[in-house]
């Protein structure tokens, strides 16, 4: 419960990328209970990649952490709800688009 509340609090902050360091430390915990709040954190930071206020170094860091967090969440795929899986895949697509724009 504490982790869920902390995850939701991190979503509310301006820089959602901070949450990913926290997410990556949760691998050994019960991902089924934490999947929905973590998916919201991932979706929020994926949207943050489109803001122009991020510097290039912040955007790169956010992109990499979002991708790692999403893969960690999807590693528990069969046990997660379909909606959470869809959110995670959508975040990976957003990351791919952001990376393609940066290199183009």
Swiss-Prot record:
Highest classification ranks of the organism:
Eukaryota, Sar, Stramenopiles, Oomycota, Peronosporales
What span is annotated as the signal peptide, if there is one? 1-19
Q: Which organism is it from?
A: Plasmopara viticola
- State its role: Secreted effector that completely suppresses the host cell death induced by cell death-inducing proteins.
Q: What is known of its domains?
A: Has the canonical translocation RxLR motif, but lacks the canonical EER motif, which characterizes most oomycete effectors identified so far.
| Family, per entry | Belongs to the RxLR effector family.
Q: Where in the cell is it found?
A: Secreted; Host chloroplast envelope; Host mitochondrion; Host nucleus
Q: List the disulfide bonds.
A: none
User: Which GO CC annotations does the UniProt entry carry?
Assistant: extracellular region; host cell mitochondrion; host cell nucleus
Motif RxLR — list its residue ranges.
52-55
What keyword terms does UniProt attach to this protein? Glycoprotein, Host cytoplasm, Host mitochondrion, Host nucleus, Secreted, Signal, Virulence
Report if keyword ATP-binding is assigned. no
Stated name of the protein:
Secreted RxLR effector protein 54
Q: Which sites carry carbohydrate? A: 64
């Amino acid at each position: 419960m504490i982790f869920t509340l902390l995850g939701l609090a991190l979503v509310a902050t301006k820089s959602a990328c901070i949450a990913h360091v926290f997410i990556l430390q949760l691998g050994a915990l019960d991902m089924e209970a934490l999947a929905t709040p973590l998916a919201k954190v991932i979706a929020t930071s994926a949207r943050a990649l489109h803001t122009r206020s991020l510097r290039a170094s912040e955007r790169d860091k956010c992109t990499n952490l979002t991708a790692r967090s999403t893969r960690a969440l999807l590693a528990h795929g069969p046990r997660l709800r379909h909606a959470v899986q869809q959110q995670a895949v959508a975040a990976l697509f957003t990351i791919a688009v952001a990376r393609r724009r940066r290199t183009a």
